[in-house]
């Protein structure tokens, strides 16, 4: 159960790494998307690109060749398409994970289980964490690269806290059911029910794991491609 919830939590950090592998590129710049420009600013300097391809780098405006302008426009287009795609993809997987766990709890424990409330709370907390990395603004998106490590740590803590409550709820609720049923050993009934819940969640994780892995690799591929484009553009300015 912990592995499934943690996988959902870690989906918010797919820009840097995911699942059991590391991406070859770790973002070192914030990306600020707005209708009138794209800004990439951080450890690699400050790059601002206008919709027509005009740009400034570290405060200096450059006179671009046709090839450089095309490079700038292509890089800008890549950022404008990739950042929303990553944001939507991560959020949809968190939602899919929540719905799957919610369904399992209903089937294994019941629709009135307190675990549903804990799961809803965790879902809201994880989405708040996601917004710390890719912030949704009224006029665009901002990617905060420094938030990745902190969100990873905070996501782990949120899952651990939720796990404690969910485990306690499951013991209490299944224990009450076992007592009401009567006969046999109530403890044995509780353990059997917990085993069934764990098995159902593990099976669901197996169903979703391949999609998580593929999404992580696709994100990494886009991040690597964007970084290559940024380096090529900046190098051409020197």
Protein language model regions, located:
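Positively charged n-region of N-terminal signal peptides that target proteins for export
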Residues: 1-7
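Bacterial N-terminal signal peptides
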Residues: 7-13
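N-terminal signal peptide c-region/cleavage motif recognized by signal peptidases
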Residues: 14-18
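N-terminal Sec/ER secretory leader and immediately downstream segment
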Residues: 19-123
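Heptad-repeat coiled-coil alpha-helices
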Residues: 92-95, 99, 106, 135, ...
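Extended amphipathic alpha-helical interaction segments
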Residues: 113-203
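A cross-kingdom marker for long, charged
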Residues: 190-238
């Amino acid at each position: 159960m912990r592995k499934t919830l943690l996988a959902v939590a870690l989906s918010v950090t797919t820009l840097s790494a995911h699942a059991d592998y590391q991406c070859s590129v770790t973002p070192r710049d914030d990306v600020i998307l707005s209708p009138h420009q794209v800004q990439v600013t951080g450890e690699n300097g400050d790059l601002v690109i206008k919709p027509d391809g005009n740009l400034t780098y570290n405060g200096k405006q450059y006179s671009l060749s046709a090839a450089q302008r095309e490079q700038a426009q292509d890089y800008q287009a890549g950022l404008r398409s990739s950042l929303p795609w990553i944001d939507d993809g991560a959020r949809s997987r968190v939602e899919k994970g929540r719905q799957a766990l919610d369904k399992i709890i209903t089937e294994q424990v019941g629709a009135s289980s307190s675990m549903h409330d804990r799961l809803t709370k965790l879902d809201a907390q994880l989405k708040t964490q996601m917004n710390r990395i890719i912030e949704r603004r009224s006029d665009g998106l901002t990617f905060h690269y420094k938030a990745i490590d902190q969100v990873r740590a905070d996501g782990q803590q949120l899952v651990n806290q939720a796990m404690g409550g969910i485990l306690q709820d499951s013991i209490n609720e299944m224990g009450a059911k076992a007592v009401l049923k009567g006969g046999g050993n109530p403890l044995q009934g509780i353990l059997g029910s917990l085993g069934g819940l764990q098995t159902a969640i593990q099976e669901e994780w197996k169903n979703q794991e391949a999609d998580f892995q593929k999404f992580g690799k696709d994100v990494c591929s886009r991040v690597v491609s964007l970084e290559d484009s940024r380096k090529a553009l900046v190098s051409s300015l020197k």
